[in-house]
Amino acid sequence: MAQPSFIENFSQQFTLEPERTALLVIDMQNATGNRTMGLGKLLAEQGNSASAEYRFDRIENLLIPNIQKLIAGFRQAGSHVIWITYGANAADASDAPHHIAPIIKATNNIAGQPEHEVVDALKPGPGDL
């Protein structure tokens, strides 16, 4: 007798209700997701561009295309798309948690700066939150 698979044992069937469902797109910002800004620029200045290639290749060739598909599907179904960004409002990042303030400052992830914006390939659309 065949054993049930692990996935079958721990999966439940469910139905998404578009009017009660939302897609959260979190931290897809230039500060950490753009190879020429923020972290990408910082790594290049430190001479570590090669070590960042894997990260940015995955973001550009896997993560962003899949998020684009999810966004299209959620919008088509009439669901909300909610954009969540993080960073600081204060230029010195004094309003950020102390453990992430240094990377926020180093990547210029400050509200109003281009690094704080969502990457161009995933700009929020009309009706998004």
Mark where each language-model region is.
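Active-site acidic carboxylates
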Residues: 1-126
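Glycine-rich oxoanion-binding loops at beta->alpha junctions
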Residues: 129
